[in-house]
């Protein structure tokens, strides 16, 4: 037997000596190892970057054992009792045998969820004339009650936010988790996050109010977790979520936008990114996540199922697919985009997405020096002497939905019924689903409960009294 492996087994044995070990339900060791890690083992990789989730109370001891064994601890995640480790592949199986190890998952690459393949020849669409009206909103906000104002803040976990006059005074924080989570001046070298932020809350000033976001007064907090190529690490996204939860009151954040993800490699209970999202929801945050862009089995071959990505498979997340409005206000001609991921989810067979929202060919803010802007020359839009970009995907639909959620939170805050209990993620999801408009001839695993209806959701959010006693009606009138 390999002496290195013996060393790790011996060190792990100290855990049994040093700790009172309760009886654990036994799980087949191989079932603890996710698909990506197993693929790495089959490929012969010497080491793998993994996220090890352990039973409560064992994280510190396992960290010490791994360090003594020469494995590099890259991060700890107290939120989900996990460690990110550069682990020798030959030790994966031994770790999985330990009863205090719950799961071993890859520190998977996450990426932005825009469908670049659908954009090269895609003509630009006009945001102001159809996007807001198809949601039941006026083309331009007519009062302060539908702007996302009154202290509503959204955490945008993406490639960054490039500051411009559409966001003046409303980017209230920026943290670069591709560089360890340092606070810094806002920037976006990839361009995806700026586009997402614009859909959520652009004032429209730069475009002479042609491209106004859904909640144009909302505050934005940027968390850069994707690099200049639009990719990042799961562990960095988890660290950003941990920071948001720990500083929720200081940041005054209510909503988290996750227009990113990776393929599902494990059941939700063993997926560290999903578990971080579940903790965020439990902490009172409203998490909106993209369904993914894997709706086609192969490009041009029709729509397929089970394409939902992580963390869109998080039970508590509001998971959003992309709809095509055909640039009309009416819903009569709306369809779900062919690329929009369908449910059910792998492993757990959860019914996702929860809703769909406009996500096809939406024009929004950009950074002219960003990777995406330079790449997608056919998607560049010039308006009022300024540059914008047209993108499609569940990322865009997620941003639109996040803007709608900001309006719901504002409507509830202004109703006077919020003083005891704010809106929760599950309640907001229920309101979006109840008020959504079903698309005819489309199944539930494709459209969820239907296409988001902002006007209907605002009415519900304004009427719900969350301070009433258990067993009483929440609707005020």
Where are these regions (language model features)?
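Surface-exposed intrinsically disordered loops and tails
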Residues: 127-140, 374-385, 423
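Autoinhibitory N-terminal propeptides
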Residues: 2-145, 153
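C-terminal subdomain of the subtilisin-like protease fold in secreted/lumenal serine endopeptidases
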Residues: 38-39, 253-257, 357, 384-388, ...
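Sec-exported extracytoplasmic/periplasmic mature domains
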Residues: 42, 67, 71, 96-100, ...
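Solvent-exposed, polar/charged alpha-helical surfaces in well-ordered, non-transmembrane soluble domains
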Residues: 31, 35, 60, 64, ...
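Substrate-binding/access-modulating region of protease and related hydrolase catalytic domains
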Residues: 58, 203, 207, 225-316, ...
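Flexible glycine/proline-enriched surface loops and loop-helix/loop-strand junctions
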Residues: 180-182, 261, 332, 336-338, ...
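Subtilisin-like serine protease catalytic core
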Residues: 26, 72, 141-175, 182-235, ...
